[in-house]
A protein has these predicted regions:
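Short internal beta-strands
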Residues: 67-69, 162, 375
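Active-site glycine-centered loops adjacent to acidic/histidine catalytic or metal-binding residues
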Residues: 24, 137, 269
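Conserved core of the sugar-phosphate nucleotidyltransferase
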Residues: 127, 141-224, 236-237
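Left-handed beta-helix
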Residues: 1-17, 205-213, 227-427
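Proline-centered turn/helix-capping motifs that create local helix->coil transitions or kinks
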Residues: 83-92, 180-188, 193-197, 282-289, ...
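Conserved N-terminal catalytic core of the sugar/cofactor nucleotidyltransferase
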Residues: 1-20, 28-150, 178, 393, ...
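Short, well-ordered beta-strand micro-motif
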Residues: 42, 162, 177, 224-226, ...
Length: 427
């Protein structure tokens, strides 16, 4: 890499290092993150969350990528090796970096900024012009070359991607304040009320191009830094990009806002994860961009077509290698190699199926089960006659065999649910 000085030309993808933030313990996605890093969580019947981000990168000719993780990185490492080794040319790489002790730091990653700080030395070896910081728990389709072009044409030190957002949806996000050139002049992380950021509204700003019902620009957690600017911004003890690094850098550097008008979803919670999967099943929201031809790269399994016998199937996605004899499947996603026995009814659920490499358990739903609004993780076994059907008002809780989140039952990986079990929210 040449380490070219910043100017007004578009940034060449070969002069960019990508750092993908894999998250910490993933407590908000527990128990799906009990045995794996967040980027390795299964999604959409046959993918992993990290596949979305890496597909965006590879389609954008970005092929030098580090994925940062802190916990349970084995399955992620295996997936990356199985899937992406063939996409990296000899002089490129897609590597997983786990938190490590060094002479400079003996601690775990303390936040998003600290994770990049501790890992930046790996990226600096190639002297890139820019570093692109992404998150592994977001679902969207983007050609990052548009972002690189914007960054160069605006002569920015930092470019932050943002999207138009309704006032009632900004509280969990970072709100961006821009001037008429879309230069960032303020940043407010997670405002409790729209009144606190009333002067951040951009619906009267022609350059922002936002609809009247989405008057705020909110950060997507996607940052493109000139490398020297990133190193300077992290030369401190700040732990988080949104809370400290971005607001401080906006005051001292030229930070530009890249408006993104596509669909985007954060899947940091079980409720959000469930919703995005159901949108994916319907082909709505973020799924639309991928169904228009932006295929997703994932592990190429050599599986036969699924066999479905005597089952009424309505509005479902069914992956390869399944054996299904159920009575009815409705509004559900059935993952690879799932087995579902006779007279079983499944509604509004996500069944993750089974990996060929699993040595603990084999995903199977027994006879005469009724399963509604559940997420059943890989390798789980559900005994005959099991009923899973809790009220929407069921409190969030963790039990020996399952967890409940926002009225959704989650059965952990390789769990064994005995025959006749009733998970119905009964007192």
């Amino acid at each position: 890499m040449s380490g070219k000085a910043s100017g007004t030309k578009a940034v060449d993808p070969s002069d960019v290092i990508v750092i993908v933030l894999g998250g910490g313990r993933g407590s908000r996605l527990y128990p799906l993150t009990r045995d794996r890093a967040k980027p390795a969580v299964a999604f959409g019947g046959k993918y992993r969350l990290v596949d979305i981000t890496l597909t965006n990168c590879l389609r954008s000719d970005l092929k030098n990528i580090f994925i940062l993780t802190q916990f349970n990185s084995f399955s992620l490492n295996r997936h990356i090796w199985q899937t992406y080794s063939r996409f990296a040319p000899r002089d490129s790489y897609i590597d997983v970096i786990a938190a490590e002790q060094t002479r400079e730091s003996g601690d775990w990653f303390q936040g998003t900024a600290d994770a990049v700080r501790q890992s930046l030395r790996h990226a600096l070896r190639d002297n890139p012009r820019c570093v692109l910081v992404l998150s592994a728990d977001q679902i969207y389709s983007m050609d990052y070359r548009d972002l690189l072009r914007w960054h160069g044409e605006h002569g920015a030190d930092v470019t932050i991607a943002a999207r138009a957002t309704p006032a009632n949806a900004i509280s969990p996000l970072g709100v961006v304040k821009v001037d008429e050139t879309l230069r960032v002049v303020g940043f407010y992380e997670k405002p409790r009320s729209p009144d606190l950021v009333a002067d951040y509204r951009v619906d009267q700003l022609p350059a922002a191009g936002v609809p009247a019902d989405k008057p705020f620009l909110c950060s997507m957690g996607l940052y493109l830094f000139n490398t020297d600017v990133l190193a300077d911004a992290l030369d401190n003890d700040e732990e988080d990009f949104g809370k400290s690094v971005i607001p401080q850098t906006a005051q001292r550097r030229h930070m530009s806002c890249f408006p993104f008008d596509g669909s985007w979803e954060d899947v940091g919670t079980i409720e959000a994860f469930y919703k995005v999967n159901m949108d994916w099943r319907r082909g709505s929201g973020v799924a639309e961009a991928f169904q228009r031809g932006a295929s997703i790269i994932t592990h190429a399994r050599q599986l036969p077509p699924s066999r479905i016998e005597g089952t009424l199937v309505e509005d479902c996605l069914i992956a390869d290698g399944c054996h299904i004899h159920a009575q009815r499947l409705t509004r559900s996603i059935i993952g690879v190699r799932a087995r579902i026995d006779d007279e079983t009814i499944i509604e509004d659920s996500i069944l993750m199926g089974n990996d060929a490499e699993e040595t603990l358990g084999c995903f199977e739903i027994g006879r005469e089960c009724v399963i509604r609004k559940a997420i059943i993780d890989k390798g789980a076994s559900i005994g005959d006659g099991t009923v899973i059907d809790v009220p929407e008002s069921t409190p969030d809780a963790d039990h020996e065999l399952y967890s409940t989140r926002s009225g959704i039952v989650v059965i952990p990986r390789v769990a064994v649910v005995p025959p006749g079990t009733r998970i119905c929210g009964d007192p």
